[in-house]
């Protein structure tokens, strides 16, 4: 789908539930969403390839530019990456941005890091039983952002940044990263649809799709609308 991205459909914690995702996309035309962003967890613990395949196929068939990062339990990483690679070939609108970045609409840059981010520089990274990374690795892998200084930046993280307004534990490294790069929008994992500001950056939790929550974000006005999937039709 070509054209400028203004309205972003933000989804968190699919947790392997493909049917609620399909119901969200049934309402896609009326939402006016130009693109989709997904914060893991995508599957459940030790999800098989067919779960990831079904999720990515549903995202691809929605026909919108889509960007995502995996959650802490989307491990082993090899299984997730294999299916992401295959489905990004089948659906060019799909863009995983775990530890990397992807351009969109000539103006936006989506970048992020999934898994649990740990501030301790001596923390061991993990990708087999869960996804966990030391904060310095996030800083290193996302330095690619410096090559796109003229782009409006959107961050995707499954670990929230440290901030008193977010009412929970968070990463000081990610908070500093946000202050350094000044993204327009930061999407983070969390319970319930919520928003906060770190400097000029809007930080949004889209809630959990497995709890029938998601959000619409206006990237121009920086406003957030909580929404829920269409109800299942009785049979």
Question: Where on the chain are the PLM-derived regions?
Answer:
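Beta-strand-turn-beta hairpins that frame and shape the catalytic cleft
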Residues: 1-9, 101-112, 150-154, 197-203, ...
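Core catalytic region of metal-dependent phosphoesterases/phosphodiesterases
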Residues: 11, 17-105, 206
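Divalent metal-coordination and catalytic microenvironments
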Residues: 13, 36, 41, 71, ...
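Active-site environment of divalent metal-dependent phosphoester hydrolases
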Residues: 15-19, 43-47, 69-80, 102-104, ...
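Short amphipathic alpha-helical segments and helix-helix/interface helices
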Residues: 25, 52-60, 84, 142-145, ...
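Conserved beta-sheet core of the metallophosphoesterase superfamily
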Residues: 60, 65-69, 88-92, 111, ...
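Conserved catalytic scaffold of divalent metal-dependent phosphoesterases
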Residues: 74-173
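A short C-terminal boundary segment appended to hydrolase-like catalytic domains
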Residues: 165-167, 223-235
């Amino acid at each position: 789908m070509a054209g400028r991205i203004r309205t972003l459909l933000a989804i968190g914690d699919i947790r392997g539930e493909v049917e609620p995702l399909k119901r969200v996309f049934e309402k896609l035309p009326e939402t006016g969403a130009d693109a989709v962003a997904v914060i893991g967890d995508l599957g459940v613990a030790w999800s098989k390839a067919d779960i990831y395949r079904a999720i990515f196929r549903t995202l691809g068939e929605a026909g919108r530019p889509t960007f995502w990062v995996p959650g802490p339990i989307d491990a082993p990483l090899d299984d997730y990456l294999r299916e992401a690679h295959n489905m990004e070939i089948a659906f060019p609108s799909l863009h995983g941005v775990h530890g990397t970045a992807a351009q969109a609409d000539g103006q936006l840059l989506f970048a992020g890091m999934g898994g649990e981010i740990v501030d301790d520089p001596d923390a061991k990274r993990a990708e087999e039983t869960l996804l966990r990374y030391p904060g310095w690795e996030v800083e290193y892998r996302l330095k690619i952002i410096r090559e796109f200084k003229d782009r409006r930046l959107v961050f995707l993280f499954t670990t929230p940044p440290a901030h008193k307004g977010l009412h929970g534990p968070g990463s000081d490294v990610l908070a500093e990263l946000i202050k350094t790069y000044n993204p327009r929008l930061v999407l983070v994992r969390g319970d319930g649809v919520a928003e906060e500001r770190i400097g000029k950056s809007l930080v949004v939790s889209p809630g959990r799709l497995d709890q029938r929550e998601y959000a619409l974000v206006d990237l121009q006005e920086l406003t957030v609308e909580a929404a829920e999937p269409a109800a299942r039709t009785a049979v």
